[in-house]
């Protein structure tokens, strides 16, 4: 009887943990899991294990958390595991060529975009922000370059007008794992050929940062509506209202003209705010010290805060 493939898995967030779950249910042997070192989290800044580490420990799998894979000791530790294949999903550490050369069948990666579009750290959010019609998962062979390797398999999903960064993430987290299992079977059988990426079509998905989430009301409403969806659940788009932070969690396009940031009107349906082109109807907001609420609830209890003519973003920056 043929020995099962020996697989080393490397990943960190929940997206990666969903892939590890699928591999644990596959016929392959997961000999070890690599994940990033525990990080401080929450109000107490207590050290917390990654979702991948938690899942590995629950299944009695060896967990390795080197701060880097660039040194000889870390590479020797990996080689000692005698992996046939390394599966990498949102690991967060660079794998040098010396590491890529260790597994017998090389290293493969599950990337949350339709490569070569959106190489890099935030492909899901950038696809929503850009107004892309579709997204998906690409399983590829890894090279030393960032998300540049030959593509083995793609699965595609449309991006709807209601999709947020969170909803698209969750959908891709369901689609990616079976694609990885299918790709591994093809590699093991020697039936899967890689397709070289066209670098001329490549775009780069820069890492998200909070500064980007500050709403610039001079931009067209169509761009801001996509930004609101892309940055939910993190980092959440925001502005200010009478000098207080105002988080914007949902919005739709609306008709209206005025100086950018000016409140044009309010009703139970939403808060209409002028943009550089057209207007935005803010439908879900969060005020300081409160929870996120549909605007209809805020309108009933705090109507005076949203008077026509007030300019959002006119005072201090939101945090």
Swiss-Prot record:
Transmembrane segments: none annotated. InterPro entries: Fmt, Formyl_trans_C, Formyl_trans_C_sf, Formyl_transf_N, Formyl_transf_N_sf, Formyl_transferase-like_C_sf, GART_AS, Met-tRNA-FMT_C. It catalyses: L-methionyl-tRNA(fMet) + (6R)-10-formyltetrahydrofolate = N-formyl-L-methionyl-tRNA(fMet) + (6S)-5,6,7,8-tetrahydrofolate + H(+). It is an enzyme of class 2 (transferase). GO terms for molecular function: methionyl-tRNA formyltransferase activity. Its EC number is 2.1.2.9. (6S)-5,6,7,8-tetrahydrofolate binds at residues 113-116. Keywords: Protein biosynthesis, Transferase. Pfam families: Formyl_trans_C (PF02911), Formyl_trans_N (PF00551). GO terms for cellular component: cytosol. HAMAP family: Formyl_trans. Attaches a formyl group to the free amino group of methionyl-tRNA(fMet). The formyl group appears to play a dual role in the initiator identity of N-formylmethionyl-tRNA by promoting its recognition by IF2 and preventing the misappropriation of this tRNA by the elongation apparatus. Belongs to the Fmt family. NCBIfam families: fmt. This is Methionyl-tRNA formyltransferase. It comes from Pseudomonas fluorescens (strain Pf0-1). The lineage of its organism: Bacteria, Pseudomonadati, Pseudomonadota, Gammaproteobacteria, Pseudomonadales. The gene is fmt.
